[in-house]
Each structure stands twice: as structure tokens, then as C-alpha cells.
């Protein structure tokens, strides 16, 4: 891990992870970046994780561990996205990710019980730490959300996420969460099987410690999740090929083959089913570096960072926007238009009339789904539909106060 960490390292000290030995040989492992309001996955944290956790796994005096966070509303909120924008060497990315992934695999397969006490957001690489634990206790704090949103940045979960999430919630729900970047709150996570127990924020660590002691003493066995019938049927070769074929077809219909990330997620999940978890874990690692430097990922990372930066602009200095223009009716343009229609009239430009028509149809279909889920009313659907227009003439966007280029 050393070469990759040195490439991006911002610190000379290791102070983001604190360890404390408790009774009965349980070690409290606390994530707490002193320089940030939230914990994020950085190269410095990853190297510290290796140097502090591996010795604990090898120490005979240590009987178990409880992972927690000192932050009031964050466990680990995924990666530091700014570092994604700086990454320019796919091999270094794979090296760093691979070292982290293999430590999590070793942790998950170890004989020492590891329990996660999740209070606040556990996203991306943060959730992958949680998934490597043997028992998960989550708080019902409003900020407690769990998810693998990597696809929204053009990449894939690459520290075991494509294997361990479906292992907990099943193939169908796991694929849905990863292919959409969907986040779930604690109570829904419990219903899905993503977490084992939900309690109040003030009790989450003590409950996790209690469960660690139960596991050590044999009063509680590590949860075994029997696959539902549909999952077992999907495991049959003929059914499996049909199932993953349909998943790929659905992904291609949504992305028009413009985004490689979702297909890589499907590939890794399928490989795990067909040839085992170990091969799939190595496939994850091999994909993360090349994906991170694709034009698609670069654009999505830029969009994320720009959006975050815009949130810091004082409202009084903001210019009033009455109409949004979007250049490009592809998947990205359609997505931006769908979000913008909630507040503004939108004009989408494309040289292809078919692309414009398809864009409008997909937006309408998305709005209809929102009506069915009661996210919006039928009246809101009609209002947003009327705000949408498409054109092949660039001059038709002259009245737009904001123009976004979304063409590939």
C-alpha cells in the first residue's frame, strides 16, 4: 500500500483511528478524523487502518472488536471525492484499493468477532467496512443512511461491496441498490437484512459491545442468512444466465452503453455467483482504477464537486434562473432535465430528433413512477411535463439563464 499512499498522502501522523482495550479482550476502534467534521476514506486513513487493525487481528489478547465513530452524525461517509479528481494513475488506484479490500476480506474471515456500531452515514467504502463485520448494529438517528453510491461517480464498489451487499440483502435488492446508488435508512436496512439490529443513538455502542461479548462467549452465533427460494433458483446455471442477461439489457436500456460502471457492477456480481467470491473481489480491484480515469467518471466527479461548491455560494449573490437549457438528450442530459423540471422550465437541445423524443419519454416514465410511489402528485407530473421542451435549433435556448452541456 505504501507507494499509493505516499502518492496522495496529506499527513505525517496517524491519528484518524483510535483503539482502546475494554473488558473481556474487546477493542473499541473509533474513526475520528481530527481535521474534518466527517470521516472520509482517504489514503491516510486506509494506511492507518492497515497498521492498526492487522496487529489487532494477530494479537491473541484481543478477542473481538467494535467499530464506531466519534462523529455525531457520520460513521464513514465514503471517499474523499476531491482525491478522485486528482487520480491519474489507474495502477496506483488499484494498488491502494486492493490492499484495503484484502484487509477487509481477512477481517471478515477471521475468527475474532467484529461488530459495527453505525450512528450516522455509512456510504461507499465506509459501508464496505461495515459489511466486512460479523454483526451490524445501527442507530435510528435521522442521519443514519447506508448505501453504495459509487455508480453515481462512474465507478463501482471495489472493496467487497459487490459481493457482501448481495450476500446480506440478496441479488435482486443488492443489484438495485448498487445500480442506482440508492441509500436506505436504518429501519429499512433492518427490513432488508442489511443490518442486524436497530437501536437509539445513545445506545448503539453499548448494544454493539454487548453483541461482541455475546459472540465471544458463544451466547450469539454469527447470523446465517438462508437464501430465499428465488435466490437459490437464480443460482442454477440456466436461470442465472437468463437473469443476468435481463439485468444487462435493462442497464443498457437506461445508459445506452454510455456508462461502463453499471455493467462492471453486474459483471462482478455475476462472477461471484458463477466462480466464487475470491475471483470477484480481484475483478472489482482490477476495474476501479481504469473506471476512475474514464471521461464519464471525470465528468460525474466534476459534477458532484461543482454541486457541492455551489451549495456554499451565498443566496444573495445567486443569479435568478427562469429557464434551464441542456445540450444533449442522452442519459446525462435526461437526468439533469428530470431534476431541473422540479423547479424550472427546461429546453433540451440535440441534433437528433429521436434522442429528444426518447429523452421526453424517459422523463415522463420517471415521473409516472414517482406518482405511483406517491413522491409527487398527478398534478405535479402534468406541471413538470409542461415545463419540458426539446429542440434541434440552438437558437431556441436563447432565453435560458443557465445552459448545461451534457453531450458525450
Where are these regions (language model features)?
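Glycine- (often His-adjacent) and acidic-residue-rich active-site loop
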Residues: 69-103, 122, 152-155
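Glycine-rich beta-to-alpha active-site loop
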Residues: 70, 101, 106-153, 157, ...
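NAD(P)+-binding Rossmann beta1-loop-alpha1 motif at the extreme N-terminus of oxidoreductases
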Residues: 309-366, 389
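Amphipathic alpha-helical segments at domain termini/boundaries
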Residues: 9-32, 37, 131, 172, ...
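Hydrophobic, secondary-structure "cap" segments at the distal end of domains
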Residues: 161-172
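Short glycine-/small-residue-rich Rossmann-like dinucleotide-binding loops
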Residues: 119, 407-408
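Conserved N-terminal Rossmann-fold NAD(P) cofactor-binding segment
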Residues: 352-401
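Conserved CoA-thioester-binding segment of acyl-CoA-metabolizing enzymes
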Residues: 6-68, 103-106
Amino acid at each position: 500500500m505504501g507507494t499509493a499512499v505516499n502518492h496522495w498522502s496529506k499527513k505525517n501522523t496517524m491519528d484518524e483511528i483510535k483503539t482502546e482495550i475494554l473488558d473481556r479482550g474487546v477493542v473499541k476502534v473509533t474513526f475520528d478524523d481530527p481535521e474534518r467534521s466527517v470521516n472520509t476514506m482517504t489514503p491516510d486513513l486506509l494506511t492507518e487502518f492497515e497498521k492498526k487493525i492487522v496487529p489487532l487481528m494477530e494479537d491473541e489478547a484481543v478477542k473481538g472488536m467494535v467499530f464506531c465513530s466519534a462523529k455525531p452524525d457520520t460513521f464513514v461517509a465514503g471517499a474523499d471525492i476531491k482525491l478522485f479528481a486528482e487520480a491519474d494513475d489507474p495502477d496506483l488506484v488499484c494498488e491502494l484499493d486492493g490492499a484495503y479490500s484484502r484487509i477487509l476480506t481477512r477481517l471478515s474471515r477471521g475468527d475474532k468477532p467484529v461488530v459495527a456500531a453505525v450512528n450516522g452515514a455509512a456510504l461507499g467504502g465506509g459501508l464496505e467496512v461495515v459489511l466486512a463485520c460479523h454483526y451490524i448494529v445501527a442507530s435510528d438517528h435521522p442521519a443514519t443512511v447506508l448505501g453504495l453510491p459509487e455508480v453515481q461517480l462512474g465507478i463501482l464498489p471495489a472493496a467487497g461491496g459487490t459481493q457482501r451487499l448481495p450476500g446480506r440483502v440478496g441479488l435482486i435488492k443488492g443489484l438495485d441498490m448498487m445500480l442506482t446508488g440508492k441509500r436506505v435508512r436504518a429501519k429499512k436496512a433492518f427490513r432488508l437484512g442489511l443490518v442486524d439490529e436497530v437501536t437509539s443513538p445513545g445506545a448503539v455502542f453499548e448494544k454493539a459491545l454487548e453483541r461482541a461479548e455475546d459472540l465471544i462467549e458463544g451466547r450469539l452465533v454469527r447470523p446465517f442468512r438462508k437464501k430465499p427460494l428465488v435466490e437459490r433458483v437464480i443460482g442454477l446455471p440456466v436461470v442465472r444466465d437468463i437473469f443476468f442477461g435481463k439485468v444487462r439489457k435493462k442497464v443498457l436500456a437506461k445508459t445506452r452503453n454510455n456508462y461502463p460502471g453499471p455493467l462492471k457492477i453486474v459483471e462482478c456480481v455475476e462472477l461471484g455467483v458463477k466462480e466464487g467470491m475470491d475471483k470477484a473481489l480481484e475483478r472489482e480491484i482490477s476495474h476501479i482504477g481504469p473506471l476512475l480515469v474514464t471521461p464519464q467518471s471525470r465528468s460525474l466527479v466534476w459534477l458532484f464537486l461543482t454541486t457541492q461548491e455551489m451549495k456554499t455560494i451565498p443566496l444573495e449573490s445567486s443569479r435568478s434562473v427562469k429557464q434551464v437549457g441542456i445540450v444533449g438528450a442522452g442519459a446525462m442530459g435526461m437526468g439533469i432535465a428530470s431534476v431541473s423540471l422540479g423547479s424550472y422550465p427546461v429546453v433540451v437541445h440535440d441534433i437528433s430528433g429521436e434522442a429528444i423524443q426518447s429523452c421526453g419519454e424517459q422523463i415522463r416514465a420517471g415521473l409516472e413512477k414517482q406518482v405511483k410511489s406517491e413522491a409527487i402528485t398527478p398534478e405535479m407530473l402534468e406541471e413538470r411535463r409542461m415545463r419540458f421542451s426539446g429542440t434541434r435549433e440552438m437558437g431556441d435556448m436563447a432565453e435560458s439563464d443557465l445552459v448545461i452541456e451534457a453531450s458525450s
